[in-house]
Amino acid sequence: MAKQPTRARKRVRKQVADGVAHIHASFNNTIVTITDRQGNALAWATAGGSGFRGSRKSTPFAAQVAAERCGEMAKEYGVKNLEVMVKGPGPGRESTIRALNAAGYRITNIVDATPIPHNGCRPPKKRRV
């Protein structure tokens, strides 16, 4: 008996008007994730995944390209308004927000959620070049 070919159902994309852009800007890379209000990820992009390797990965331009890519993916879900949460001290903090603004999103709120230790772990030793 021949097996019936099972067809995968076309996935219905939910429409979300308001989203949250989580920007994690480390010294080495920038990760941009756009979620809905509940925290379910809709789209994400990184500077490294956008084609930048090595020291170019940690530049503001690489963060800008990652934000543009993430913004294009989130447009498919109908996101129009973004609340921005920035974490980390990296060089891509400001350029990411500018790129999201230029991509046509209305930025409603910007929150700096950088984790600051209350004298927690010992920091890495200073570089001697």
Swiss-Prot record:
Q: Give the superkingdom in one word.
A: Bacteria
Q: What Gene Ontology cellular-component terms does the record carry?
A: ribonucleoprotein complex; ribosome
Pfam families attached here?
Ribosomal_S11
Q: What is this protein called?
A: Small ribosomal subunit protein uS11
Key words of the record: Ribonucleoprotein, Ribosomal protein, RNA-binding, rRNA-binding
What is the scientific name of the source organism? Answer: Aliivibrio fischeri (strain ATCC 700601 / ES114) (Vibrio fischeri)
GO BP, one example? translation
Q: Which GO terms describe its molecular function?
A: rRNA binding; structural constituent of ribosome
Assembly and partners? Answer: Part of the 30S ribosomal subunit. Interacts with proteins S7 and S18. Binds to IF-3.
Please give the PANTHER family that the UniProt record associates with this protein.
40S RIBOSOMAL PROTEIN S14/30S RIBOSOMAL PROTEIN S11
Which InterPro entries does the record associate with it?
A: Ribosomal_uS11, Ribosomal_uS11_bac-type, Ribosomal_uS11_CS, Ribosomal_uS11_sf
Query: By its UniProt entry, which HAMAP family does this protein fall under?
Result: Ribosomal_uS11 (MF_01310)
Q: What does this protein do?
A: Located on the platform of the 30S subunit, it bridges several disparate RNA helices of the 16S rRNA. Forms part of the Shine-Dalgarno cleft in the 70S ribosome.
Q: Which family does it belong to?
A: Belongs to the universal ribosomal protein uS11 family.
- Secreted: is it a keyword of this entry? no
